[in-house]
């Protein structure tokens, strides 16, 4: 009798797993060959712990526009065609979303981000530009001070840019007037090492995680909000607009002062406001730092590109060392370089969405059932020769814009292949803010320093997506800095 129990248990598990691994075949979708074999279980392991690389391998394994795959015991539908991905994510009318109901009652995260999108309009960004530029100056002062103290000229620029990103977040999202290059023991500086040591499992890493950092970051938000609501502090930053939204005030327009309402009527509790801020912290930290890092990695191998960028930057007025917001849009060649960086090293390598109600694919017999996961592998698409010639070569001029051309890609007929900041409901609402922060860092570094890469480092440099999905260089990026002679008024 007792011998039957393990046999029955094993049989139940075996049949259950086999049923899961036959999901796409039973529904008639093109799918990979799945089974309880050692080779397939290795694939499942790789998709769990080396998620990005394994999904890219699945993208390259066939020619079907759709492919049913399995991430551990989770059926996932992989989209391998750009036009189909755009159709699904742009025209599916709410069939797909990123998360369950969150933040505030009556809002999905998708809709909440739509409400907050006006915070990142041109008018608002121009008024926040002074704060961004001040943080950029902190970065340059720190690097100049290291040289002045006789320290080695070689620095890990990736780590410095992560601190720069944290400073941006601290000053504009958490409302703190702080320079983390000087306050190395601050909680937001400590968060850098905490985020790098997060869970490596892709599935487990998405589960709600509470740590002492969550509560300490919430305390920062609580203190900053109290200063604004109870003491009338007005500061032109993102937090000020979040607090306006919390009080039911418009975030568009040109008003910064609060019109407080009763606590019972507030749209966001402190807890949920802190969750919004922490999510912005997680996304912005790696997106900004990685984009600037990989731009430097590529352009420093091409002196002609650096020369063109410096010539473009030289045309900026730069009065008393200060940039003008309205002039940054005229940096066309820098825009091309950033697009090429985002193509080759997208901060969001995979878009993952959950079907919230059954969706019939256009011009197809297939239907995606509610609850099933859809993946769009941006990294693999951006490096596909079908869409971009010489995909591993850094070619900013592939995005050259002309008067009669939208300027997506010069060497292919596909006009909408580039998806640098997402697509449809997954598009980053803060992309204009991110571009602004990235441009300020690049301009100030190229203005103030001659930068040089070690050729041997470039040969051995490894790009990593661990923890998934963020992209970074595994061992940092060492760059030799030499101060450039510029206008003495720049730092008077």
Curated annotation (Swiss-Prot):
**Similarity comment text for this entry:** Belongs to the cytochrome P450 family.
State the Gene Ontology terms under molecular function: heme binding; iron ion binding; monooxygenase activity; oxidoreductase activity, acting on paired donors, with incorporation or reduction of molecular oxygen
Residues at which heme binds = 428
Q: Which cofactor does it need?
A: heme
Q: What does this protein do?
A: May be involved in the metabolism of insect hormones and in the breakdown of synthetic insecticides.
Entry protein name:
Probable cytochrome P450 310a1
Gene symbol here is Cyp310a1
Q: Which organism is it from?
A: Drosophila melanogaster
* Membrane-topology descriptor: Peripheral membrane protein
Q: Which UniProt keywords apply?
A: Endoplasmic reticulum, Heme, Iron, Membrane, Metal-binding, Microsome, Monooxygenase, Oxidoreductase
EC number annotated for this UniProt entry: 1.14.-.-
Enzyme class, spelled out: oxidoreductase
**Which domain of life, per UniProt?**
Eukaryota
């Amino acid at each position: 009798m007792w011998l039957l129990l393990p046999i029955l248990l094993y049989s139940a598990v075996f049949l259950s797993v086999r049923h899961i691994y036959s999901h796409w075949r039973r529904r008639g979708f093109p799918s990979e060959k799945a089974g309880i074999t050692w080779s397939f279980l290795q694939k499942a392991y790789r998709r769990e712990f080396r998620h990005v690389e394994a999904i890219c391998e699945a993208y390259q394994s066939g020619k079907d526009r759709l492919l049913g795959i399995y991430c551990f015991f989770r059926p996932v539908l992989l989209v391998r065609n750009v036009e189909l991905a755009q159709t699904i994510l742009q025209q599916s009318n709410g069939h797909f979303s990123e998360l369950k109901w969150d933040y505030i009652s009556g809002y999905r995260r998708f809709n909440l981000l739509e409400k907050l999108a006006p915070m990142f309009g041109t008018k608002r960004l121009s008024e926040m530009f002074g704060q961004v530029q001040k943080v950029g100056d902190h970065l340059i002062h720190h690097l100049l001070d290291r040289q002045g103290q006789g320290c080695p000229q070689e620095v890990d620029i990736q780590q410095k840019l992560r601190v720069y990103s944290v400073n941006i977040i601290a000053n504009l999202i958490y409302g703190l007037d702080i320079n983390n290059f000087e306050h190395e023991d601050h909680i937001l500086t400590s968060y850098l090492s905490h985020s790098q040591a997060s869970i490596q499992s892709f599935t487990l890493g998405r589960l709600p995680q509470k740590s002492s950092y969550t509560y300490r970051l919430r305390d920062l938000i609580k203190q900053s909000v109290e200063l604004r609501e109870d003491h009338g502090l007005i500061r032109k930053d993102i937090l000020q607009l979040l607090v306006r939204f919390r009080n039911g005030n418009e975030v568009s327009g040109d008003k910064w002062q609060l019109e407080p309402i009763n606590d019972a009527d507030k749209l966001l509790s402190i807890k949920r406001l802190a969750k919004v801020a922490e999510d912005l912290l997680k996304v912005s930290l790696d997106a900004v730092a990685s984009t600037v890092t990989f731009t430097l990695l590529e352009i420093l191998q091409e002196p002609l590109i650096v020369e063109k960028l410096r010539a473009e930057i030289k045309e900026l007025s730069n009065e008393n060392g200060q940039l003008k917001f309205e002039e940054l849009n005229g940096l066309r060649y820098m825009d091309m370089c950033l697009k090429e960086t985002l193509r080759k090293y997208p901060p969001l390598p995979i878009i993952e969405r959950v079907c919230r109600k059954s969706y019939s694919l256009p011009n197809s017999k297939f239907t995606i059932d509610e609850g099933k996961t859809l993946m769009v592998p941006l990294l693999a698409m951006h490096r596909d020769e079908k869409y971009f010639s010489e995909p591993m070569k850094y070619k900013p001029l592939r995005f050259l814009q002309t008067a009669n051309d939208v300027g997506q890609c010069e060497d292919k007929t596909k006009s909408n292949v580039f998806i640098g900041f997402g697509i449809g409901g997954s598009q980053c609402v803060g992309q204009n803010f991110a571009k602004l922060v990235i441009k300020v860092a690049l301009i100030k570094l190229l203005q103030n320093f001659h930068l040089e890469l070690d050729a041997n480092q470039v040969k051995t440099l490894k790009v990593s997506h661990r923890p998934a999905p963020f992209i970074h260089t595994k061992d940092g990026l060492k760059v030799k800095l030499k101060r450039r002679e510029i206008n003495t008024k720049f730092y008077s």
